[in-house]
Amino acid sequence: MVRFKHRYLLCELVSDDPRCRLSLDDRVLSSLVRDTIARVHGTFGAAACSIGFAVRYLNAYTGIVLLRCRKEFYQLVWSALPFITYLENKGHRYPCFFNTLHVGGTIRTCQKFLIQYNRRQLLILLQNCTDEGEREAIQKSVTRSCLLEEEEESGEEAAEAME
């Protein structure tokens, strides 16, 4: 039996228009990335990346996207992402770009990176707060995320101890 190795690209869709994120759909995003790969790398790139390519996770509120592709051709996908300058959906065209946050071998490593990334973003927001109410809400969010991570780690340790 052969194991197919994949790479996961954790990306952030950055746009000034909030309607851009809300109109996200995984099929539209998948076809946009495939078309961009075909435009940049030609038929070879389109054929090589079409096997095993998928949008594994999409969060329309935060703009986080997880793309899966074959390990041998992830650099073709990665190099085509800067050429995406707009998102076209339902007759509207929104200017945007992709910011690649992390490239990982498993979804789990991308999740761990995303937790750390979100924690850093919350700390930056905490430093830029002007209102005390905002500051308390962000501190609660940071504390909650730390507590959830500690519970996960203790749950993993308990599962290992039972084995």
From Swiss-Prot:
One of its GO terms (cellular component) is ribonuclease MRP complex. This is Ribonuclease P/MRP protein subunit POP5. Component of ribonuclease P, a protein complex that generates mature tRNA molecules by cleaving their 5'-ends. Also a component of the MRP ribonuclease complex, which cleaves pre-rRNA sequences. InterPro entries: Pop5/Rpp14/Rnp2-like, RNase_P/MRP_POP5, Rnp2-like_sf. One of its GO terms (biological process) is rRNA processing. It comes from the Eukaryota. It is found in: Nucleus, Nucleolus. The modification Phosphoserine is found at residue 154. The keyword NAD does not apply.
